[in-house]
């Protein structure tokens, strides 16, 4: 394990990974133990997938793995499905309106898992399958940071969560301050909504253009 991880700055995994099989779960746990022993920052996207395992199975595994996590990404049903923490009532048309419940859920993660130093989430008000408002929120060092709200007409609603996570990690490893990190992450996420297929084929400059634009109504 060491030969694969010893030169890494961060280790990123999602809830999809240990759900694949018991062997993969054990491999992830082994990697996380190595990271903890060698001061490698661990970032976890809870990313619950009900077709892969039940909430009960997810909670047993993910609550155990959380002892190794430094930074947590939790969206929508992830809080309750993987950790048993209530933060979202299941209505995607009012996600942003539930921001106080999200904040409390994020705080509860840090209370139950004190090794987790920061938590971030994507909040959405979805009005139709294609039309919605999107924003990011980031809790770190005892303070919440919120991105602007972006109104988006989606071309394809696939991969936006992964785009958010990737851009969030990009911000962390490149030393962005917390506000810039969450603004960059949500900008990458909404940009992905205007691109077909899974891969967010954009540059940092593309994301900055969205991030620095005063126009928060996006469509392509």
Where are these regions (language model features)?
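Ribokinase/PfkB-type carbohydrate-kinase core domain
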Residues: 1-144, 150-151, 203-209, 218-220
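Conserved post-catalytic alpha-helical subdomain immediately downstream of the catalytic base
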Residues: 144-213, 218
């Amino acid at each position: 394990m060491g030969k694969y991880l010893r030169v890494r700055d961060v280790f990123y995994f999602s809830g999809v990974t240990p759900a694949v099989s018991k062997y993969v779960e054990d491999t992830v746990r082994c990697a996380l133990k190595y990271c903890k022993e060698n001061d490698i920052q661990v970032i976890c996207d809870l990313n619950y997938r009900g077709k892969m395992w039940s909430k009960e199975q997810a909670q047993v595994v993910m609550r155990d793995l959380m002892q190794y996590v430094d930074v947590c990404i939790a969206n929508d049903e992830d809080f309750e499905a993987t950790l048993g923490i209530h933060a979202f009532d299941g209505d995607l048309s009012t996600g942003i309106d539930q921001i106080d419940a999200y904040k409390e859920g994020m705080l509860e993660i840090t209370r139950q898992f004190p090794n987790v130093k920061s938590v971030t989430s994507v909040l959405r008000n979805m009005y139709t399958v294609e039309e919605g408002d999107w924003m990011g929120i980031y809790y770190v060092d005892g303070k919440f940071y919120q991105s602007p709200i972006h109104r988006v007409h989606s071309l394809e609603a696939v991969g936006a969560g992964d785009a958010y996570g990737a851009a969030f990690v990009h911000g962390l490893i490149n030393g962005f301050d917390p506000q810039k990190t969450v603004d960059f992450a949500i900008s990458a996420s909404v940009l992905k909504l205007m691109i077909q297929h899974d891969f967010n084929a954009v540059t940092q400059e593309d994301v900055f253009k969205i991030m620095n634009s005063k126009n928060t109504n996006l469509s392509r």
